[in-house]
UniProtKB/Swiss-Prot annotation:
Disulfide bonds join 4-16, 8-21, 15-29. The cysteine framework is VI/VII (C-C-CC-C-C). The presence of a 'disulfide through disulfide knot' structurally defines this protein as a knottin. It is found in: Secreted. This is Turripeptide Lol6.2. Keywords: Disulfide bond, Ion channel impairing toxin, Knottin, Neurotoxin, Secreted, Toxin. Expressed by the venom duct. One of its GO terms (cellular component) is extracellular region. It comes from Iotyrris olangoensis.
Length: 37
């Protein structure tokens, strides 16, 4: 799995559940992992 560094959105809900969404004007999901496909 790859480390997530993605914009927090509905498309990366799985990532955000296992990572940390943070930011002020830009929200990134950091510290989670990309779901295996």
């Amino acid at each position: 799995s790859l480390v997530c560094d993605l914009e927090c959105s509905a498309e990366v809900t799985t990532c955000c559940e296992t990572g940390t969404c943070h930011g002020i004007t830009t929200y990134n999901c950091v510290g989670g992992t990309e779901p295996e496909t």
